């Protein structure tokens, strides 16, 4: 029986971006199952780019190989922006690669024009997009009627879409490589603390862009439960993030009676809106 052919379209899996890392973890997992014929479609690379040939699955880019067409794209700002998301080669990719499943992982505007393609939904089409703010972008809402398999990265976006009548929208969080996260033996941790002259405090650190999908209230609620259940650990929560967007972190901390002090991070960034919160 033939394996299902899956075309996964996003940033190149070796790029150090959120989409790139997510795609790498997804492709690596699916490849290990041996159940699928995988094809990677990468934005920002030419169709036959040599850089895409060093993975265990097939890889193609979304920019044309022809230098003359590349020049035409370069002088047309709108065309160049759309080309960065794959519009130049997506029809060719579907025709030549003949996927059973198309999975697009990008911001919702990356799929501009895709929903009206003759192949859309004739191939099993899945969109996994980041909706980072409320209210939900109008283009993301209008797209819901044309996307049969619509996945978002954050549950707040799923809830908002369902309030608008789009009950088929579901949440799938970004994929982690769990082999990268593990607890060191107590002896090793003790040696590291001694070597770096660290106090025996329990510090939970989070470096992030302050967006609604980051679930900051859940983190603070969890930390408070942990702190109250383990008062002898001298636990601290270190948040390195932005003040001027997303969650009102200072307000949340005050509501939870967690904040004792906070420090302006003037050393790590020139932005006056960047703060380190040390909660204890």
Where are these regions (language model features)?
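Conserved donor-binding/catalytic core segment of Leloir-type glycosyltransferases
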Residues: 8, 198-214, 220-223, 238
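A short helix/loop element that forms part of the nucleotide-sugar donor recognition site in Leloir-type
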Residues: 182-198
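Extended catalytic core of nucleotide-activated donor transferases of GT-like folds
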Residues: 50-149, 155-159
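Short donor-sugar binding/catalytic loops of nucleotide-sugar-dependent glycosyltransferases
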Residues: 12-14, 207-212, 243-244
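Nucleotide-activated donor-binding/catalytic signature segment of Leloir-type glycosyltransferases, i.e.
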Residues: 241, 247-280
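Carbohydrate-associated surface elements
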Residues: 44, 156, 175
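Short beta-strand->alpha-helix junction loop in the catalytic core
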Residues: 172-183
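N-terminal subdomain of nucleotide-sugar transferases
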Residues: 1-48, 53, 97
């Amino acid at each position: 029986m033939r394996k299902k052919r899956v075309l996964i379209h996003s940033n190149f899996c070796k790029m150090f971006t959120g989409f790139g890392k997510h795609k790498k973890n997804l492709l690596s997992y699916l490849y290990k199952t041996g159940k699928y014929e995988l094809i990677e479609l990468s934005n920002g690379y030419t169709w036959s780019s040599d850089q895409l040939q060093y993975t265990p699955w097939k890889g193609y880019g979304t920019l044309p190989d022809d230098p003359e067409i590349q020049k035409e794209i370069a002088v047309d700002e709108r065309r160049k922006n759309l080309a960065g998301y794959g519009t130049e080669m997506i029809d060719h990719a579907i025709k030549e690669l003949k996927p059973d499943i198309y999975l697009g992982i990008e911001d919702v505007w990356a799929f501009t024009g895709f929903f009206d393609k003759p192949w859309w939904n004739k191939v099993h089409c899945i969109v996994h997009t980041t909706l980072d703010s409320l209210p939900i972008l109008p283009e993301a809402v209008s797209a819901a009627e044309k996307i049969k398999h619509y996945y978002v990265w954050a549950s707040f976006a799923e809830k908002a879409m369902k309030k608008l009548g789009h009950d088929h929208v579901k949440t799938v969080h970004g994929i982690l490589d769990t082999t990268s996260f593990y607890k060191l033996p107590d002896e090793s941790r003790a040696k590291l603390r001694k070597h770096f002259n660290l106090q025996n405090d329990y510090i939970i650190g989070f470096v992030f862009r302050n967006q609604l999908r980051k679930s900051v209230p859940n983190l603070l609620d969890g930390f408070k439960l942990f702190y109250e259940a383990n008062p002898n650990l001298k636990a601290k929560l270190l948040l390195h993030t932005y003040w001027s967007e997303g969650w009102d972190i200072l307000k949340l901390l005050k509501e939870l009676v967690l904040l004792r002090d906070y420090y302006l991070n003037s050393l790590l960034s020139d932005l006056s809106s960047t703060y380190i919160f040390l909660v204890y």
